[in-house]
Every structure is written in structure tokens, then in C-alpha cells.
Amino acid sequence: RYLVFSSDRRQQRRIFLYDLSQRKLLPLPGLNQPRVFYDQPDISRNGRYLVYTSEQEGKTDVFFYDRQTFQSRNLTKTYVGQVRNPTVSGDGRWIAFEGDRTGQWDIEVIDRGVQPDLIESE
């Protein structure tokens, strides 16, 4: 039902959410702040949760956005290394992304169960 994508529309990299059944772009309050780079979005099955990368303060991090509360949360603030290509599970509980803290790209997983904890990949 939903399509999420990033675009350089209006000279700034932003995230857009398109409702395929209503055939229109939906608002994302709290996202797409001026002078902030947003990229690589993914959306949960029901369309409530988004994950994306954003470069703020010179570091790219993975963020989690709840469309019901309009809140974003930095999931990799203390992660040492680069991150890319986040994805969210259908129910919004699990977030996976590529990270290079070991010197090579590995898959890292965050369980949002109670508190997001970083689970190290094997």
C-alpha cells in the first residue's frame, strides 16, 4: 500500500511517503528538517514505522520514525563505524543494517522489543 523513497526534490535530500491506494503523498511531520540529509528509507508492512539514514553532525546514523507519534529516534548514536542500508521488519520490531565497525561490512540487528539493543553479528 505504501511506497517510501528519498529524492533531491527542491535541492534537498528528503524522504517521501506515497499512498498507492489514495494516490497521493502523505505528510511526515518532524522529518525533512532544513539542511539535514535523509536517505535509504524503508517502511514496515502496516506503514507505521520507517527507518532511514541521516547525516547529522558529520556522522551517518540509522533512525527510526513512528508515524503515529511523529517521533524519530537515533538507533546508532553510539555505534562506532559507518552504517548503511537499513531495513525494518514487517511488524517494526527488528531493524537490520550494514555496519563496518569490525573493518568489514557486516549485518547488524537491533531488537526494539523493550529497549533497542545492538545484537552483534556473528
Can you describe what each PLM-predicted range is?
Residues R45-N46, G90-D91:
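Residue-level detector of Asp-centered blade-edge/turn motifs that repeat once per structural unit
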Residues R93-E122:
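Blade-level signature of beta-propeller repeat domains, shared across WD40, Kelch, NHL, RCC1
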Residues R1, S44-R45:
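Repeat-blade elements of multi-bladed beta-propeller folds
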Residues R1-S7:
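Beta-strand-rich domains and repeat architectures in extracellular enzymes and scaffolds
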Residues S7-F16, N32-R35, T53-F63, K77-V80, ...:
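A flexible loop/linker signature enriched in serine peptidases of the S9 family
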Residues L20-Y38, Y65-Q82, D111-E122:
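Multi-bladed beta-propeller domains
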